[in-house]
């Protein structure tokens, strides 16, 4: 009974994080289309600012315990690896894919992350994937494809660069799901997500120099940045990764496909985006994946 309650809690947290990502995507779309923001500028600002925010909150709650992770060399290296090869790598390769193709193509390719995780888990455990695990992966990827392209494969722009960076973003998404779990159990959300974003943001800021490409910071921009940084980054990653620490990387990555569902609904309601009938099938496939995972438990992963 207690295990089922904890599983439901993990599913809820993971879904809530994915929904926050979907909401923040609409704020990001507004900044790109109306305020002239670039992907490099927004990602560097969101990671660094959200990281600082979480570390401040963490210090208020935990004080000097916030730095305990650096007292153990192995854990400090894991945290640095999560920051660079998980958090930063996933974010950066996703937006580079968008640059070489479009958002729909990038979303579909990154949605292959559960496949990467399932392959890793099965190889590590020397087990074949179970039928419902394969069904969940296929359902989620197909659902994301339908939502991102409206069922038209010609809406995907698969240049060599887009394919390379898109697959890299799937590996990055798998990495931050897998790398975060042990650290979260030992140190909590504020330490892992806070330092992960802070270090990742520092590295990216050094590369893209966002201060050289500032956009006008009017009221609309600040409100949209609040949505991206607070709702879509600090809160979203904290909820999502806490959920992943409970349900596991494979299930978490599949539940995270709720993001495009939320993004399309919010875009249709507030940004005037068109809603097509084929999107309903995508909704059904993704929500069916969520239902399937709530009833079954995948292989032990992390």
What positions do the PLM features span?
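Helix-helix packing/entry segments at the starts of transmembrane helices
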Residues: 18, 45, 87, 91, ...
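Hydrophobic/aromatic residues within transmembrane alpha-helices
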Residues: 31, 42, 46, 97, ...
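Transmembrane alpha-helices of multi-pass small-molecule transport proteins
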Residues: 35-88, 116-120, 171-179, 193-212, ...
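Structural signature of hydrophobic alpha-helical transmembrane segments
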Residues: 39-52, 95-113, 159-171, 220-231
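Specific transmembrane alpha-helical segments of multi-pass solute transporters/efflux pumps
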Residues: 59-105, 146, 229-247
